[in-house]
Design a protein with these regions (language model features):
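Metal-dependent amide/peptide-bond hydrolase catalytic core
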Residues: 1-30, 47-48, 60, 77, ...
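Acidic/His- and Gly-rich active-site-bordering loop/insert found
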Residues: 4-181, 200-207
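Short, highly selective alpha-helical patches that border small-molecule cofactor pockets
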Residues: 58, 62, 66, 188-191, ...
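Conserved hydrophobic/aromatic beta-strand scaffold that supports enzyme active sites
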Residues: 93-97, 250, 272, 360
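Short glycine-aspartate micro-motif
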Residues: 105-107, 176, 246-252, 272, ...
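Short beta-strand segments
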Residues: 109-111, 215, 251-254, 467-469
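Glycine-rich, phosphate-binding/catalytic loops in enzymes
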Residues: 123-129, 230-232, 268-269
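Acidic/histidine-rich catalytic neighborhood of metal-dependent amide-processing enzymes
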Residues: 168-264
Length: 505
């Protein structure tokens, strides 16, 4: 096991950097109960995307976060940014900036929104927002057994989390169960704990560069908080107004595998295909043009080599991020079908040939030859390729394919391969911070989904770790959990990583 390497405790660093880290870690140990209580407080405030709230609403998660930062920090400058209102209500990004001796930046982000909890009955005590204490153990490779609230559940886990169990000596961990514990309020606590510890430990010293913490709204839907921070496209957001020519690095804090740095992720495009035909009475279907049927003809042939070759043509053979995948027909609707707010389906026009149909494609894609330049050409290629394919297979219908810019996220990659990524200065420092904290080399991974890094990197072009955070699982499922020890380890890892990136003067 790699855990036999032991904790290095930053032995490669010199004073005063090592002293600040040691004192900061001691502060975190002394305030462990307080930090865990803060996590419970954040979880108790529902923040499904759109309900994150504002700094002047103490009953919201953003208000609670801001109040804590205002009360418990002295050197950091706090700021908020109203994200443009939509039907989801007013909400704000929350920032903490600790000025350093130079313009070198270390930017760390988290997100404050969660997905919906689902059925309350699936959670301990029927309350997804009341943190429950349980245990988790790996029952066999690729599977865990979670015990909480008198229940025992066996679940499969991702390979990266499974590998973490191979690296550790213990076979069981205490966990905290609740909606948002893992995704992503534990990461918020890691950053707040690290900042408070850093202020306590710096004394007469200052950071060698400037630390920026951004707690962002709307990650789960369209990354609206990250886009507002960096204003992807025109660079007039909060970040670029303050740092016009930024130099530095970025770490996106998110529920992960125990501080195993994710060095990239594929891009994502949700393509909406609309087919319009001609309606007629169902007794004479030959007089119309069935939009649903013609759409189905196109969907039935997307696995053919000719389509695969065409849609994959701009992309490189990407050994880091992997190959392009196309999931066709992820949703489909046509004719006169409605779903009410309670989820009941209502049908009308069952005796009519449908004159319209919409279906969606989920496309995950690697880098292209000109990456990261010209991402809009890739978006246009996906639209044109899918529309042309369905149009060629279908009959007398009109076909259009569109990718909403809000649903288009370019890939992010730190290097050409995992081996090369390990040697990137930012990655090597995240590994050392983790090794010093948890006692083993966590390795590197590639994130399975997109994170706020897609928006942040495309606007700033700063080297970015796309995911780094505490260990846990079941992020979008009932019984979501984070490992208790990993929350505290996260604060320790982030204070060390901050010192490694910026130094102390």
């Amino acid at each position: 096991m790699e855990s036999s390497e032991g904790r290095t405790h930053s032995a490669d660093l010199e004073a005063p950097a090592r002293d600040v880290i040691d004192q900061g870690r001691a502060w975190i140990d002394e305030h462990e109960a307080e930090l865990l209580e803060f996590l419970s407080e954040l979880v108790s405030q529902p923040s499904v995307t759109g309900r994150e709230g504002t700094h002047d609403d103490p009953e919201s998660v953003v208000g609670s976060l801001y109040d804590t930062l205002e009360a418990e920090t002295e050197r950091a400058t706090l700021d908020v940014q109203r994200v443009p209102d939509d039907d989801r209500g007013p909400r704000e990004n929350c920032y903490a900036v600790l000025e350093g001796a130079t313009d070198e930046l270390f930017v760390c982000t988290s997100h404050t929104d969660t997905v919906a909890p689902g059925d309350d009955a699936d959670w301990p005590g029927t309350d997804p927002y009341d943190v429950s204490v349980g245990t988790v153990r790996r029952s066999e490779p690729g599977a865990i057994e979670l015990t909480v609230g008198g229940r025992r559940e066996k679940r499969t886990i991702r390979d990266a989390y499974d590998r973490v169990w191979d690296r550790r000596d213990d076979t069981e961990r205490d966990v905290l169960v609740g909606r948002g514990t893992y995704d992503n309020k534990a990461s918020v606590v890691c950053l707040v704990g690290a900042l408070r510890a850093l202020e306590s430990a710096l004394g007469d010293h200052t950071l060698g560069g400037t630390l920026v913490h951004g707690h962002l709204v709307g990650e789960e839907i369209a990354q609206v908080g990250a886009k507002a921070m960096v204003s992807r496209g025109d660079r007039t957001g909060w970040f670029s107004e303050r740092f016009s020519d930024p130099e530095g690095t970025v770490v996106v804090m998110d529920g992960s595998y125990g501080f195993m740095p994710a060095v990239g992720h594929r891009g994502l495009a949700w393509v909406t295909l609309r087919t319009e035909g001609e309606s007629t009475h169902a007794s004479t279907p030959h007089l119309g043009s069935n939009a649903v049927l013609e759409t189905a003809k196109g969907l039935a042939t997307v696995e053919e080599p000719s389509f695969r070759e065409t849609i994959a043509s701009p992309f490189i053979d990407d050994s880091l991020l992997g190959e392009l995948t196309v999931a066709a027909g992820t949703t489909i609707i046509g004719g006169d079908v409605r779903r009410d707010r309670e989820g009941r389906l209502e049908r009308a026009g069952v005796n009519a040939v449908p004159d319209w149909c919409e279906t969606t494609f989920d496309v995950r894609f690697p880098r292209w030859e000109a990456y990261p330049n010209d991402p809009e050409a890739i978006r246009a290629h996906l639209e044109e390729t899918i529309a042309s394919h369905v149009e060629a297979e279908a009959g007398d219908v009109d076909v259009t394919a569109t990718v909403d810019p809000a649903e288009y996220f370019p890939p992010v990659a730190l290097a050409d391969s995992r081996e090369a990524a390990r040697n990137h200065p930012l990655v090597s420092q995240t590994i050392e911070a983790a090794r010093s904290t948890v006692g083993y080399d966590p390795g590197v991974t590639v994130a399975p989904g997109v994170t706020d890094a897609a928006s942040i990197y495309s606007a700033t072009r700063l080297p970015t770790i796309v995911e780094y955070g505490p260990a846990g699982a079941l992020s979008h499922e009932p019984l979501e959990f984070v490992e208790r020890e990993s929350v505290i380890d996260g604060a320790k890892a982030m204070i060390e990583l901050t010192i490694r990136q910026l130094g102390v003067v």
